[in-house]
Curated annotation (Swiss-Prot):
It comes from Yersinia enterocolitica serotype O:8 / biotype 1B (strain NCTC 13174 / 8081). The keyword 4Fe-4S does not apply. It catalyses: a D-alpha-amino acid + A + H2O = a 2-oxocarboxylate + AH2 + NH4(+). Belongs to the DadA oxidoreductase family. GO terms for cellular component: cytoplasm; plasma membrane. This is D-amino acid dehydrogenase. Oxidative deamination of D-amino acids.
Amino acid sequence: MRVVILGSGVVGVASAWYLAKDGHDVTVIDRQDGPAQETSAGNAGQISPGYAAPWAAPGVPLKAIKWMFQRHAPLAIHLDGSASQLRWMWQMLRNCDTSHYMINKSRMVRLAEYSRDCLKDLREDTGIQYEGRQGGTLQLFRTEQQFDNAAKDIAVLDDAGVPYSLLTADQLATVEPALAKVAHKLTGGLRLPNDETGDCKLFTERLAKMAEQAGVKFIFNRSVEKLLVDGDQIAGVLWGDDIIKADAYVVAFGAYSTALLAGLVSIPVYPLKGYSLTIPITNPAGAPYSTVLDETYKIAITRFDDRIRVGGMAEIVGFNTQLEQARRETLEMVVGDLYPDGGNISQATFWTGLRPMTPDGTPIVGRTSLKNLYLNTGHGTLGWTMACGSGQLLADIMSGRRPAILADDLSVSRYSADFRPLNVAPLHDAHPIR
């Protein structure tokens, strides 16, 4: 089957890889001059199934108001009055109750755990290198309340069968030695030993080369104008005066998927702006071993080979990609507080990207009402964590196989009024934002 994939971020390239493995004739189209040039370029570097959770959670609306008056707030909202922004925010608010949170988190953990397994298989099969580490993730607490609240996270992890260990402040240095100097600032941490890290951009670039060697065709520097429709199916992709035709089409355009699909398929995907710093390591002993998450500021600090990636924050500002100095100061403050001797902040590279976020936090993977149009978008802050699983899942669906995990509640049909999801095991309450 001839397949056209729109988008060459980590999700689009992973989709191309798994579809090519199934013997399909795959073409990937992107407006950039290479893969992973936008949202996949500078993310926090985490592959963290254990922390897969929606931003829409109980208590978040009140916290958002409080954060409006904080200098280093993890979430910022700038109202522009647009219908798309207001509609998305209203949908997110409707998902901030406990019942919706439980359902949404269960979906996300299911896909994230599966995706890590797919990545592990891919790594073993191909030997792909991307400065990856299998050193786990450590969530750091600065207050006793945060430490006590970890019991809720532990209940969720128990339900999902995710290994963990709860550490006191004195024990943190056993897994992150550089924290010994700052342990007095912390109350403890929650460690997930099965989480991984890696350079998402490097992974995507190398997987794209492998996919190309497997027969995938990449067309860069082409801006897609619209999808052409004939009856109940897509007839082609238009750019300029050219039309490319295929048997099936996959939209993996991230935050730009919504506009491309306007008038064809309604999806609630909205850009959530994030930031990162990439810092050269000057003292390996003073740098993180793997990844730590600062629970107070929602900032992740990740170790690559000779660099530290510091990423986080969320701004609801539409498609604004301007670099804000205040956000850089927050990133510098957190990494300087926890790892003051690890790297040279003055030589850091500052980056921003637009994560494609759904109001319920779960990505949209699968079929649409148009019989040859498929979606793989809306992964929010977890595109790197969920990419391989989403790609394999989509390849299974398009190849006529039964997916290895429940997939009906990952498709866009879950937003229809008559959708009735299959029963899933309930989760205890846990909040990703406190």
